[in-house]
Each structure stands twice: as structure tokens, then as C-alpha cells.
Amino acid sequence: MNLHEFQAKALFREHGIPVPEGVAVSDPAALGEAISSLGGDAWVVKAQVHAGGRGKAGGVRLVKGSRELEHAVGELLGGRLATHQTGPAGLPINTVLVESLTDIGRELYLSLLVDRARRRVAIMASAAGGMDIETVAAESPEKIITLHVDPAAGYMPYQGRRVAFALGLEGPQVSALVKLLGQLYRLFVDSDASLVEINPLVVTKTGELIALDAKINLDDNGLYRHQALAELRDETQEDAREARAREHELNYVRLDGNIGCMVNGAGLAMATMDLIKLHGGEPANFLDVGGGTTAARVAEAFKLILSDEAVKAVFVNIFGGIVRCDLIAEGIINAVKEVHVTVPVVVRLEGTNVDQGKQMLAESGLNIITAESLTDGARRVVASVQ
């Protein structure tokens, strides 16, 4: 789950991490109060969407005077912002963040994330702040500093000093970064985050460290421990199908192809997509219906897949380990009838009661193609859309 910048900065403030003075505005009528609260005669207006590249797309604007501020807020609120991360449709702008200006001396990069290979929290830092960190990693990997935090010991001040020296900080700035990293680590652990990023972390001309931007991604598996954070979810920033899938305990990710996939098990789902690609097809989605698949869940999965108009065929690949194949076949038949599926459906079943399941599909009288193997199923479904 992603947080908006203004939500992330609110958490930063709670943990003592310095951020610019700012006010989140969702209604233009609240601008007067925001101006009074912030003071000054120049501000930065930032569109609040779950995507990077906002500045290049016109979503971050420097304004002078209340008239320019009103114009910028009026243009952004209620519109959509398309960046290189959103696709051409963009994301809706329901809130803007109005902030006081910061006197920037240097721009740095700082983040904490989960390194799954090392099973540790990784601290990443770079003197090339304000840039796309993926670009820095690809073009100048030597500019990125990476340290790992031992989960038993936790963050240690010496690690902060190593980062500070590598970034070229001096004097009080070293102590400030050591403290800031400790606060970031505590926030990361306390909120079950998967990523906490500051880009840029600025050194002002007076030598202060300020988080000019803030990005927090939370681990969905830990949200049950953080009800207040879970309530910050903005579903308008998410794919509507993915939100609907969550309600029915389905793991769904939309892709760009035309072959819908329904599989039980994440590993089998990925293997299924690989084979579709291998045979010249393009998966329209990743969909894991889970181990305890039921007829109702299968029906909902069909509805979800077919709500994508790009889908021209569906490949159902189920291994009946926890559930019996005859029950799965019954669910598929009922779902095809209920949803009025008009595209070809290729089904590959394997496991408990597989013969009964295949017989039920064959006798259903529906447009269901039974595959003998995973490879056979991939070939058949790709052929059906060509």
C-alpha cells in the first residue's frame, strides 16, 4: 500500500524528521486558510498522486502570489496527471500539497528498503539526489552507497556516520544525519514499511537537513497491525480491478496482453504466464485464486478477468492438491454459465479426481477446451486468439 506525500510527511513529523511547512488542500475554498497558515508570498504546489515523475509532467509548480496559487490549485485539483509511471490515462488529483519554499544548497538521496536477498533492511544513499534513482543505479552505480542493518542489533550510529561521510557532510550535519537515519529506521520498523524514501533530502544553505519529498510503501501483510494506517489507503489511485480482487481475497495484477489467466498458486501462475509468452501469447493479468479455491471465488475471478475488454481468451490452470478437481470443474461450469463467457476458455486440471473433473467439463456442452498438460494448454489458448 502506498501513501501520498502529505501522508508520509505527517508520519515524518510524528517521528521528528524535519519537513517543510505544508498544508494539504482538497477544496479550493480552503486556500485562504492555507495561505494564512504558511505565510509568505511564494509557495510550491504539488499534485498528490501515487507516481514518480510529477515535476516533469507539470504536477509540481512554483507560484508567486495568491492569484498564481489559486490558478495552479484550480488547474490541478480534479484533473489527472500522467507521468512515465502511470500510463497515458494518468491518475486523478484529489489533493494538492502547498508548501513553503526551501532554500536548497545540495540535494541528496536517502532510503530504507527491504533487501529480500540479504534478508535485511538496506540503507541506500547517494549524493545524486533529486534524480530518478533507477537512472543513477543504471548509469552511475558507484554513486550509490548501500549498507545493511542487522535485524538483531538494529540501526547503529556508526552506520549513519559512514553514510554522512560518504555524502560529504561535515560538522553538525553528520550528527543530524545520524539522528535522522535513526528516526527513519524506527518509522520503517514501527509501520511495517517496505520502502521509506526521501528524494531529495536537501541540505539548506544554512546547513540544515530537510526531507523535501517523502515516499512510504507499506507491506499489505502487516496492515492488520496498523488500522490507522490502513485507513489512509486511497483506492482512487489504484486499479479498480485490483481493489475489487482484494475484497474477494484474490491476488490480481493487470497486464497488457489479451489472454486472461486464472491459476491457484503464485508460482504456478508465473510459470503459466511464462509459457504463454514462450508460445507467442501475451498474458492479460496475473491472477492467483489461492489454495482453498471455491466455486464462488472462481466465478468472481471470471468476472474480474472478463471486465477487461482486452481479454480474448481465458486460460484456467488449476492443480487440485488442497481442493478436488471435480469441485473446481463444477465451479468453472457454473461460473461460465453465470458470467455468460463468450470467449474461448482453455482448462488444464491436474490432481485429485482429475478424471471426474475432465469428464464434467466434456459433458457440460459449453465452449470449454480441455488441455492435457500445461504446455498443451498454453499452445491451445495462444492459438485461440491468433
Swiss-Prot record:
UniProt GO BP: succinyl-CoA metabolic process; tricarboxylic acid cycle
Coiled-coil regions listed in the entry: none
Subunit structure: Heterotetramer of two alpha and two beta subunits.
Family affiliation: Belongs to the succinate/malate CoA ligase beta subunit family.
One GO molecular-function entry: succinate-CoA ligase (GDP-forming) activity
Signal sequence coordinates: none
Top-level taxon: Bacteria
Domain ATP-grasp: 9-244
Binding site for Mg(2+): 199, 213
EC number(s) stated in the UniProt entry for this protein: 6.2.1.5
Keywords carried by this UniProt record: ATP-binding, Ligase, Magnesium, Metal-binding, Nucleotide-binding, Tricarboxylic acid cycle
Reported cofactor(s): Mg(2+)
Binding site for ATP: 46, 53-55, 99, 102, 107
Matches recorded under InterPro entries: ATP-grasp, ATP-grasp_succ-CoA_synth-type, ATP_grasp_subdomain_1, Succ-CoA_synthase_bsu_CS, SUCC_ACL_C, Succ_CoA_ligase-like_bsu, Succinyl-CoA_synth-like
Pathway: Carbohydrate metabolism; tricarboxylic acid cycle; succinate from succinyl-CoA (ligase route): step 1/1
A cellular component term, taken from the record's GO annotations: cytosol
Manner of cofactor binding, per the entry note: Binds 1 Mg(2+) ion per subunit.
Lineage, opening ranks: Bacteria, Pseudomonadati, Pseudomonadota, Gammaproteobacteria, Chromatiales
Free-text function comment from the UniProt entry: Succinyl-CoA synthetase functions in the citric acid cycle (TCA), coupling the hydrolysis of succinyl-CoA to the synthesis of either ATP or GTP and thus represents the only step of substrate-level phosphorylation in the TCA. The beta subunit provides nucleotide specificity of the enzyme and binds the substrate succinate, while the binding sites for coenzyme A and phosphate are found in the alpha subunit.
Catalytic activity: succinate + ATP + CoA = succinyl-CoA + ADP + phosphate; GTP + succinate + CoA = succinyl-CoA + GDP + phosphate
Residues where substrate binds: 264, 321-323
Name of this protein: Succinate--CoA ligase [ADP-forming] subunit beta
NCBIfam families, sorted: PRK00696.1, sucCoAbeta
